[in-house]
C-alpha cells in the first residue's frame, strides 16, 4: 500500500471509529510479528476499537474496499495467523471486559480480550471455574476460542471451544450476529477454532463448573515408554481424573540421552486425607511415585507459578502440535526420539507434552481429530535460535507430514505450513463445507488472509 493510500485509510478510519486508529511506525512494528517470530507482515493501520460497533464499522469499510483485516488478541499464534500485510489489524485486547459471572447459570460472559487469568480470578471468587484451562493463563479468551483451547482437563471436558455456549460475531461483511448451536449454527461452529477466518468474536458466553475445595496431585515417574503410554490411556479411559498432565523429557545418560516420562494425576476432593492412593493408582505401571501434593483448588486453577513469557531477541517458536490416533502414539513418539536432536528442544529443558482423551469429548468441525475412539494431543515445542531455525522448521514440517500420514490432525494455532493438498487432508470430508461457510460469511476473503488456502 502506498503512502498516499495509507494516509487515506488512516483518515477514513479515524472518521468512522471512536477508538484509537494509528499508523505510528513503532506501533506497526509491534504488530508485524506474532509469538512464533517467524512470519513478518507489516500492517498499514492498527485499530483499537472502543466496542463492537467500532469492529462493525471497520469490517464494513474493509469489505467495501477489499482491504484485509486481521483480528489479534495477545498474538500467541506462530504462523502469522493474526498478522496482515498492508491491511488493518484490529487489536481486540482492548475489548477486555468481563461482563458477568453467573453462578446460577454456571457461565460467564466476556469480551474477547479478557485474559483467562482474569476470568479464573473472577470466577473462583464465587466458587466456580472454567471446565478447561490451557497451560498458559495469559492467553485471551477470544484467542483460545479462535484456536482450540486444549488443556490438562480436556480428557474429561473437551476443548474450551466445546464449552462455549454463545457468541457475538462480526462477519466478513460487517454483520453483527448473535449465534449459538441453534441460532446461526454454521457461523458459531466455524468461528470456534476457525482462526479468525469466518468472523470476529466481540462477546463470548462460556460454561463454568463448581469444583471441590482441594486438589491432590500424584506425580508418577516412568522409565518405560510403553508403560507411560498405557497408563495415559487407562487414566483417560477409566479413572476419571479431573486433570492429566503428561510430559516426556530428555535426560542425560553418560554420553547418550534417554527419555523419561512424568504423569501428574489431579483429583479434586473435599478431604485429601480421605483419598485412597492405592485405589486411584491401582493397575498403573509407574516406576516411582515421586510426590503427592495437596493444595487449594483455587490456587491450582490460578496457575500463578507460570510466568508470562515474551520471546527474547533471536528466539523463534515453530511448535508442532498434532492430534494422533492412539494406535500410532507410541510408534510416533519413538520416531521423535530418534529424529529430534536434544538441542532442537532446548536440551534437557525441552518437553514433549501428551494429553490423552477419548474421541467423543470434542465435536467441532474446525477442530479436526482422528477417528479412533482414543487419541492424544502431542505437543513438541522447540525454541530455535536463528542459525538453527531452518533446520528446526524443516524437522517440524517432516513431523507434521508424518502425523498426517498416520491419521493425525494438526492444531491450527501453532506452526502450520500447509499447501492446499495438506489442507484438504487436514479437513477431509469437511473441506467442501468449510469452503461454503467461508464464501457465505467472508465472500471477499478479507479476514485473516494468507493462512488457510481455500478453494478459488
How would you name each of these model-derived features?
Residues 25-132, 148:
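Glycine-rich N-terminal segment of FAD-binding domains in flavoprotein oxidoreductases
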Residues 54-67, 121-135, 175-191, 393-400:
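Short, hydrophobic/aliphatic alpha-helical segments
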Residues 103, 140, 171-172:
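Short, acidic, Ser/Thr-enriched surface-loop or helix-capping motifs
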